[in-house]
């Protein structure tokens, strides 16, 4: 949580400072547009990393007094979350200051809001409780789990962040070169740098679901690929984890609890409800983002439940979904 907070602070407090410094750095002479961009980017990034040093020193001192801390893992998270965020914001600021000049501050403000909103939009619209973000790295989930962050997935995501940094630096250099005569070899070099970022970015984005950066409904359907349809439900499950003889019980239990909850709430509920049944805790944690919790998402009329938790949790989650009739419109919580 501390690393995520520092990543957000560097973006919001460091961004305007970076913008002011970027305007001054641009006036310095450079032998080529690309070298000038790399020099300016590293100056901004170095400042961002320096801003992160004092809080890191305080945390190191605190961890030395707490026995259950993992200092190496904490250092890795700090480098990957706010550290990489500083490199990303430095590239963003450099590009905006070159492309928009006087309006760069307003564009940066809007972009930071969009980057801040992205995880919330993703969590609200996709079947996941976590999100990865180029500014603050990752948000590990809206659940009661006390799980270690997936460092491997975060490392791969930060490779995607670096790819975007490379592309932004190449575009910035290209924009600067428009203001001065440039050789064909220089233009080819910039194109090569851009492709150096584009190719890995395209590969990583193509595999985003499989790598764990996100969990789209399309991807979830490939894992829970069998569907049992009843009068009021679309029940998705992994057929390898559900004996054929249990399907009738699962369908009947869903419909029985639906009728019972509807009568108890004295409502008419017309939406079809989607029930995602996970074969085990590991699969639920990897795809949805929680191991210990069963979750209802009333605004989407869906439930995420472990196959072994149907009898214990189905009614509880169904109440959340159907009681949305009494909640605020569009959210229902």
Ranges and model annotations:
Residues 42-104:
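Secretory targeting signals
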Residues 1, 54-78, 113-159, 219:
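Membrane-interfacial interhelical loops
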Residues 1-23:
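Long, hydrophobic alpha-helical segments
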Residues 180-210:
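Internal/C-terminal transmembrane anchor helices
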Residues 104-118, 189-196:
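Central hydrophobic cores of alpha-helical transmembrane segments
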Residues 217-332:
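Juxtacatalytic substrate-recognition/specificity segment
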Residues 26-42, 97-105, 178-187:
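Membrane-interface helix-boundary motifs at transmembrane edges
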Residues 13-21, 91-95, 164-179:
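Alpha-helical transmembrane segments
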């Amino acid at each position: 949580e501390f690393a995520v907070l520092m990543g957000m602070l560097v973006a919001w407090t460091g961004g305007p400072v970076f913008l002011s410094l970027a305007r001054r750095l641009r006036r310095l002479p450079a032998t080529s547009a690309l070298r000038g961009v790399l020099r300016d980017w590293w100056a901004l990034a170095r400042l961002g990393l320096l801003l992160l040093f004092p809080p890191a020193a305080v945390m190191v001192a605190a961890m030395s007094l707490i026995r259950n801390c993992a200092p190496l893992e904490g250092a890795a998270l700090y480098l990957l979350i706010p550290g990489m965020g500083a490199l990303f914001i430095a590239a963003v600021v450099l590009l905006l200051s070159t492309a928009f000049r006087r309006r760069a501050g307003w564009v940066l403000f809007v972009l930071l809001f969009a980057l801040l909103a992205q995880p919330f939009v993703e969590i609200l619209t996709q079947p996941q409780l976590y999100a990865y973000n180029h500014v603050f790295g990752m948000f590990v989930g809206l659940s009661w789990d006390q799980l270690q962050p997936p460092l491997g997935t975060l490392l791969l995501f930060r490779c995607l962040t670096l790819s975007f940094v490379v592309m932004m630096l190449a575009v910035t250099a290209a924009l600067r070169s428009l203001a001065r005569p440039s050789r064909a070899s220089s233009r080819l070099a910039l194109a090569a740098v851009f492709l150096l970022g584009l190719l890995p970015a395209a590969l990583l984005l193509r595999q985003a679901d499989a790598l764990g950066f996100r969990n789209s409904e399309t991807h979830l359907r490939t894992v829970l690929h069998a569907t049992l349809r009843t009068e009021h439900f679309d029940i998705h499950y992994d057929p390898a984890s559900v004996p054929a003889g249990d399907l009738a019980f699962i369908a009947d239990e869903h419909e029985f609890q639906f009728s019972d909850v509807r009568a108890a709430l004295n409502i008419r509920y017309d939406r079809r409800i989607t029930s995602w049944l996970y074969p085990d805790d590991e699969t639920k944690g990897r795809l949805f983002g929680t191991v210990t919790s069963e979750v209802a998402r009333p605004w989407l009329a869906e439930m995420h439940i472990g196959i072994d938790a149907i009898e214990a949790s189905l009614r509880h989650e169904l109440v959340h979904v159907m009681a949305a009739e009494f909640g605020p419109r569009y959210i229902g919580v």
